[in-house]
């Protein structure tokens, strides 16, 4: 614009700068220290973000509804995502943020993404290497804290969904510097010992990214990949993701869901996969169409949204200025009130007090005379009313006595008749109750005797008395129920009625065929 150009209004120039700024800085990421933080009752956040050389004012609309769990304060180091705009009433440029990350969390998220990309490039998350879950797993290893609610949720689901199962718990700490190492050692323990575990569940409840960081350690990822036993990761809530989830063979949204997954058969998985495929295909088309319509709608109304934000910011600034004005006025009137109080303590106050005392004495004398006159009149009226009321009360009392006498005679007749009827009913009910109690006692005794006989027949010690024996491995870790688990020269502990014996296996037959 040259010197000879016609002058333009400030608002026109400001709008031109605003359009130019918003077009070239539509998406910016700024980091720095917060100052002058103010969270309004409307839920909008106003602040300044600065470094050692510059300061930038900013606004975050509807902040309270998005970040209700933590309120920023002066001195916080943050990373802001937003766009640059101009607040026209003050002629200053500012950032309007739509996302805020505290610096510590930002560093962890960046470290998470870098580690995830590197391990993925090395093949640790390759779907081809993932192992399928066995159908009908019955022996399940669980790696989690022994005191939390997670293990109780898993046991409750397994008890409801699985008919036969055995859980082997390896207790670990699930948070802190040693958690990743303990979980890795647990995975190695199950793989190196012949526990015959069909699947492993690594479980933990929800938490922040710092709480779940142990499950992002590279040591744990490599232990999961090296495991020959299929592993289900059930860490955090459904919205939480860790590197443990990507490395494991199956990811469950919650520990309870992991227990349900391990109980499912391959047919159930296949059916659920087909249903899910149909559901995703159908809803994806609907979702894309809806989002296209929504995008078109918001593109048309984007200008009105910016106008609303500007108006809201003006309203918040006006409210803040009004509050400051009210505080200033209050302070002014407090000072004026103090001046009036000092003035009233002068001679004027003394004259006013004397005049008030004279008025008070005259008023009290007049009140006493009025009270005496009204009291005399009231006593006369009260005496007359009392005599009339007493006469009426005597008439009502006599009438009530007559009615009471009639009711008393009728009540005696009704009570005598009712007692006879109730006595007969009571005798009948006592007879029926005695018969019912005797019948129930007889049935309960018969049922108790049957249960005792059944329990006696199921008692393993009674079975041993009939010539049977129980076989255990040498260390009595598990019961031997199949000849397939035996091989030649194995040492077996035999439990008899009156003692135990250790025997060595010479030969094993399966269905009349010799095993070895």
Curated annotation (Swiss-Prot):
InterPro entries: Exonuc_VII_L, Exonuc_VII_lsu_C, OB-fold_nuc-bd_dom. The keyword Hydrolase applies. GO terms for molecular function: exodeoxyribonuclease VII activity; nucleic acid binding. Its EC number is 3.1.11.6. The keyword Hydrolase applies. Its main location: cytoplasm. Transmembrane segments: none annotated. Keywords: Cytoplasm, Exonuclease, Hydrolase, Nuclease. One of its GO terms (biological process) is DNA catabolic process. Signal peptide: none annotated. GO terms for cellular component: cytoplasm; exodeoxyribonuclease VII complex. It is found in: Cytoplasm. It catalyses: Exonucleolytic cleavage in either 5'- to 3'- or 3'- to 5'-direction to yield nucleoside 5'-phosphates. It holds the Pfam family tRNA_anti_2. NCBIfam families: xseA (TIGR00237). Belongs to the XseA family. Bidirectionally degrades single-stranded DNA into large acid-insoluble oligonucleotides, which are then degraded further into small acid-soluble oligonucleotides. PANTHER family: EXODEOXYRIBONUCLEASE 7 LARGE SUBUNIT (PTHR30008:SF0). Heterooligomer composed of large and small subunits. This is Exodeoxyribonuclease 7 large subunit. The gene is xseA.
């Amino acid at each position: 614009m040259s010197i000879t150009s016609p002058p333009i209004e400030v608002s026109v120039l400001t709008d031109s700068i605003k359009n130019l700024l918003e077009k070239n800085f539509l998406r910016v990421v700024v980091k720095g220290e917060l100052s002058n933080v103010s969270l309004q009752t409307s839920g909008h956040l106003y602040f300044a973000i600065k470094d050692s050389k510059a300061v930038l004012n900013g606004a975050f609309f509807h902040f309270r509804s998005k970040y209700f769990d933590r309120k920023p304060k002066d001195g916080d180091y943050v990373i802001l995502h937003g766009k640059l705009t101009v607040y026209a009433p003050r002629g200053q440029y500012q950032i309007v943020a739509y996302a805020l990350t505290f610096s510590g969390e930002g560093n962890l998220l960046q470290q998470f993404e870098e580690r995830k990309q590197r391990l993925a490039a090395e093949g640790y998350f390759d779907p081809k290497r993932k192992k399928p879950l066995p159908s009908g797993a019955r022996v399940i290893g669980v790696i989690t804290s022994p005191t939390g609610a997670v293990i109780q949720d898993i046991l409750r689901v397994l008890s409801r969904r699985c008919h036969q199962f055995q859980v082997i718990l390896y207790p670990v700490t699930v948070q802190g510097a040693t958690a990743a190492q303990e979980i890795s050692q647990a995975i190695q323990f199950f793989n190196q010992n012949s526990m015959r575990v069909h699947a492993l569940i690594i479980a933990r409840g929800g938490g922040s990214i710092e709480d779940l960081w142990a499950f992002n350690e590279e040591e744990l990822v490599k232990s999961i990949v090296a495991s020959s036993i299929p592993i289900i990761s059930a860490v955090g809530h459904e919205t939480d993701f860790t590197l443990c989830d990507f490395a494991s063979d199956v990811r469950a949204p919650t520990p309870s869901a992991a227990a349900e997954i391990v109980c499912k058969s391959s047919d159930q998985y296949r059916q659920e996969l087909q249903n899910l495929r149909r559901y995703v295909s159908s809803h994806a088309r609907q979702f894309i169409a809806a989002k296209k319509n929504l995008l078109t709608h918001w593109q048309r109304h984007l200008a009105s949204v910016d106008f609303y934000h500007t108006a809201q910011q003006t309203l918040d600034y006006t409210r803040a200025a009004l509050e400051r004005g009210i505080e200033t006025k209050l302070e002014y009137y407090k000072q004026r009130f103090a001046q009036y109080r000092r003035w009233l303590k002068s001679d004027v106050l003394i004259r006013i007090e004397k005049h008030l005392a004279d008025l008070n004495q005259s008023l009290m004398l007049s009140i006493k005379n009025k009270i005496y006159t009204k009291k005399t009149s009231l006593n006369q009226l009260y005496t007359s009313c009392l005599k009339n009321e007493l006469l009426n009360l005597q008439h009502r009392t006599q009438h009530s006595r007559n009615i009471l006498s009639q009711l008393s005679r009728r009540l005696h007749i009704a009570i005598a008749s009712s007692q006879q009827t109730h006595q007969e009913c009571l005798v009948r009910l006592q007879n029926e109750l005695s018969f019912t109690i005797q019948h129930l006692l007889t049935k309960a005794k018969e049922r108790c005797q049957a249960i005792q006989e059944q329990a006696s027949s199921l008692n393993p010690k009674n079975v041993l008395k009939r010539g049977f024996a129980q076989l255990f491995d040498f260390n009595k870790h598990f019961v031997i129920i199949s000849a397939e688990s035996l091989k030649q020269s194995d040492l077996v502990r035999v439990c008899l009625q009156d003692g135990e014996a250790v025997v060595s296996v010479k030969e094993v037959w399966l269905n009349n065929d010799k095993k070895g």
